[in-house]
Amino acid sequence: MRAAGHGRSRVVRVDRGERAVYAVAGVVTSLAGALGRRRTHAVSKAALMPLLQVGLVRDRRLSPQGLGALLGATGAAWVGDLVLIAPEGGESGEASRRRLRKGAAAFAVQQLIYAGMLVQAGARPRPRSTAVVAGTLLGLAALDTAKESRPDPVVTAYGVLLGTTGALALGMPRSAGDLAIGRIPWGGASFVASDAMILLGEQVLTGRAAQAGHGFVLVTYALAQRWLVDGLAATARLKPVE
């Protein structure tokens, strides 16, 4: 009994340590991004998904399918994170749009995996939350089209997947006693808010408002990933820790 109890306490300590490191990396990423500290921002942002992956690999309760899916999703997000880090010397608007398309393509893979896992976990879109998500994305699409003169097919396709994941997450049934699953709706909402601000920052915001918007993008992104990965991992576990 002592050995089992000691093992459980060690798991809890490790889990808390990993969460603390991720939280620090998220704060540093957000502040560095808002303040224009590009090198610090690049290093800390590149560490976010690997930190989540460490926790996933250490979680022996995860099913092989769940582990593989979440590693694939966070791996795609890591590629997207690297692509979306702005170059230190600045870039043209056209180059920024190309970078946005590449990032959207990588994150589309993640959203597809998340949506599939949510459906498997019993999530279903609800009319009210779906209407809110759809209205938000349609408004952003209209803004983007007005600025770019025609819809961007890559960004539009990503927006559809993002909206699907967001609506599913907001429709996730509650699980009594499981806080991680209960945070899935918050993760979906945060992801939509984060990506909405990316487009607003590109099309509308300038100066200090753009910097503040960038900080908002990063903090909501870090929270969204934490909540979604934790929640989806909870839906994919086979057995409790012994």
Each language-model region and where it sits:
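Short amphipathic, positively biased membrane-proximal segments
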Residues: 1-242
